[in-house]
Amino acid sequence: MSIIIGIDHGYYAIKTAHCSFPAGLTSYGEHEPYTRQGLLEFGGCFFVCGSGRQPIQRDKTVNDNYYLLTLAAIAKEIKQRGLPPECSVRIAAGLPLTSFGRDKPKFKDYLLQGKQPVNFRFEGVEYSITIEEVAIFPQGYAALMTEVGLLQDEPSMLLMDLGGWTVDLMRIDNAIPAADTAHSLELGMIRCVDDIREQVRRETGLSLTDAQIENMLAGQPCTVSDTVRDIVNRQGRKYTEHLLSATMEAGFDLHAIPAVLLGGGASVVSRHLSPKDGLCKTIFLLDDKVNAVGFERALTAVSRRKSEV
């Protein structure tokens, strides 16, 4: 029996139902690096997955980076579930609705590339994975399968998926996506973090890491001065205001319809919203793995319907 594994291929992070790691990839060629953590051996070459951040590439199929990160994600999820390293897998992945129809065939072929089974080593463990199927679903909307009640309670709502590079917007009317309202803003968490880093450098001369900024935005411990923390919080509020303004300018009246916010940036907005924003209603899905879980449930539902025919 094959295993369904949902994978959210973000610009900022790769997520499965139980794992999340940065979408960075460092190639070491034929030379084994110093660490086994995140170490992928494939095709005679060594790669460290989850290190740093790779350059933004609008087309994720232009090189093998996201395929290699997919193998790492499969290995991590299999290990987390306590499953054998030799198994058959059905991948449930996603794309933004704004590019769904255009990119779906290419992304599906990309994830199915190569001979089966796919043999590789991850963190010292040998894997032999047969990818039986790749199914692609709309990001954001699939995540609502984890909160079915949301679709039943409101006639209209705005879905806001705050990813690494983009914030994808789409109105949902009577539980059906209004595809003609799909809109994408280049205001994801990478933009937020980069702006904060630059502002801190400008005001204090200090160079913060992504991890430091992310911890402070999430309200988690980080050893910095109160001055730096104040700058980060101020910029977090500024980012939230900019996002709300851009969403309104895109034609979505946040004072009139409820908004469901998910993705890695949702926690930032949740901490920096103010009553003076006057929003109709905001619902936060704060688990950054919610898309991956939604993809799995969507493929499970599709498979069930097929078996009943």
Language-model features: locations:
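Nucleotide/phosphate-binding catalytic cleft detector across ATP-hydrolyzing
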Residues: M1-M157, I176-R191, E203, D210-V309
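Conserved blade-register residue in beta-propeller folds
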Residues: T16, L169-R171
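Ser/Thr-glycine-rich phosphate-binding loops at phosphate-binding pockets of nucleotides
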Residues: L162-D168
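A contiguous pocket-lining binding segment that forms or flanks enzyme active sites
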Residues: Q199
